[in-house]
């Protein structure tokens, strides 16, 4: 696991962070001796009455701070990156990708294709599961991150590989079983492409997806709308 440097961007007034004399530009290195991978590690490790923080001050000094607090209390700080990690991008080339259809000259962030299960939980984004590792699945189950929103497109593995232009897209469907067995609530989405994943293929997909109810709470059908 890589070590991330978490730079504080703001310290809230009358917070634990202010009492500890934390400042914007300080970096959180660890909590209770554990590296902090992302915001979920941060929240999980902070949920304790006694925590030990390792902070690197702007001048390079390292402070070890012992904190006694209420179990659910936060430091009251904000970080430069709210996810506290890099956003994971999509490795697929879907035949219907709406980002590929966007006109040039727009805000740069609009062209970023995210496929990050953490953003699925935090912001409701849909993920394809193709870049989700066993480690990611373990963390989702450990932290009870649900619901996770999944772009299925089809439950036919070969067809899914074709639609996503990713030879691993069919195998990724096995991860749904892990989420189901871990009691991780899911919502589904199928982008419906005429003559490809409709009719018999759609009926097959819906039949297979029904096996995951009630953990899979919904499946939305989104008719594709390609533009030139």
Regions found by a protein language model. Name each.
Residues 12-17, 37-39:
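Short alpha-helix capping/helix-loop boundary micro-motifs
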Residues 16-21, 43-44:
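Short, surface-exposed secondary-structure edge patches
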Residues 19-37:
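Conserved PDZ fold ligand-binding element
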Residues 40-54, 69-72:
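Short, compositionally biased
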Residues 60-62, 69-216, 223-228:
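Conserved Radical SAM active-site core
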